[in-house]
Amino acid sequence: MKHLAMILFLITSLYSHEANCTDMFGLIYNKNLSDVETAKYIKYYIDDLGCDANMTIEIPDLSIRPNLLEYAYDANKTKTFDTLLAKGTAVNASLATSIGMSFAFFFRENGVGIDNKKASPELLEFIKNQKYKEFKEEKFKLIKKLLEHGQDPKDYKVLKIILKIINEEKDLENLLKDGAKKELAQ
């Protein structure tokens, strides 16, 4: 049923020769579409309908204008995220902030949040376990990819603060230095 609805929507868009490019934001958050399906539709909107990969959406009472890349990150649609990067969607500071905040949320979800800018003994113990190590490795791979796509290393201020609280800022500093060196070499 979801495929039929999507096909009808796309045919209607083509017939009217007008595509509402902001629909890409809805496609990304559509829980009925897999990541692979979403990436396919996003590619179609950009390549065939001429939508801008760098479009943003205005949200009242919010000073930033999130882009498609941020939506794909928040929806945890990695294939869609990679498709957007390949289509030239710009990385921005608010995406880096979201990545930093995801560390704080991850700690809180695991019952070991940061309180009053201090790491509890439980948090310091938690960061030794495999679950955290895998989470950190996944996020650092993402950061490396974003640096390769032009992310400014200075955008990771929030993450630096969080990692400093748990005495892990050196790993990030090394990653950001390596990314900056590659940027200078290009």
Predicted regions and their residues:
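Classical Sec-dependent N-terminal signal peptides that target proteins to the secretory pathway
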Residues: 1-18
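N-terminal export/targeting and maturation segments
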Residues: 16-44, 149, 181
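Ankyrin-repeat boundary/"N-cap" motif
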Residues: 19-32, 54-71, 92-129, 155-164
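Ankyrin repeat structural motif
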Residues: 35-47, 76-85, 107, 113-115, ...
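Ankyrin-repeat C-terminal turn/loop position
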Residues: 50-51, 88-89, 112, 151, ...
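Extended alpha-helical scaffolding segments
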Residues: 129, 133, 143-156
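Terminal, low-structured helical/coil segments at or just beyond the last alpha-helical repeat
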Residues: 158-186
